[in-house]
């Protein structure tokens, strides 16, 4: 069953959040928004604060989900992360990383696949 893109994205973010919690991450924020943009998930992984972009798709018809994160989108995430770091005054306390989680949904049933790409991009 197909839903609108916003519903698909929200469902994928929930799957991704559960996945990283089960992988030992601590979720600090979900859907952090500011005037510069949005970050889907901000989490702590040991001594890293990780800014995670989640991309959810039905299959690979239009390429892998991570291919949708072009330089412009990366730059927007980076600037939003900078604002978060300043706002929380954590610039000297942690390392920082940008990860991507790809969620591929199955159109026939509730199965899905998930792929975590650590250090997916650097600016």
Curated annotation (Swiss-Prot):
GO molecular function: nucleic acid binding
Family of the protein in this entry: Belongs to the UPF0102 family.
HAMAP family from the UniProt entry: UPF0102
Alphabetized Pfam families for the sequence: UPF0102
NCBIfam families: PRK12497.1-3, PRK12497.3-3, YraN family protein
Protein's name in the database: UPF0102 protein CLJ_B2665
Coiled-coil residues: none
């Amino acid at each position: 069953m197909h839903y609108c893109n916003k519903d698909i994205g929200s469902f994928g973010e929930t799957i991704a959040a559960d996945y990283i919690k089960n992988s030992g991450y601590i979720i600090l924020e979900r859907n952090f928004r500011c005037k510069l943009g949005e970050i889907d998930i901000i989490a702590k992984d040991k001594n890293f604060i990780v800014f995670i972009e989640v991309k959810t798709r039905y299959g690979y018809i239009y390429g892998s989900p991570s291919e949708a994160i072009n330089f412009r989108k990366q730059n927007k995430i980076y600037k939003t992360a900078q604002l978060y770091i300043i706002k929380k005054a954590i610039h000297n306390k942690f390392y920082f990383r940008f990860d991507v989680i790809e969620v591929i949904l199955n159109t026939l049933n509730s199965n899905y696949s998930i792929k975590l790409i650590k250090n997916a991009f650097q600016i």
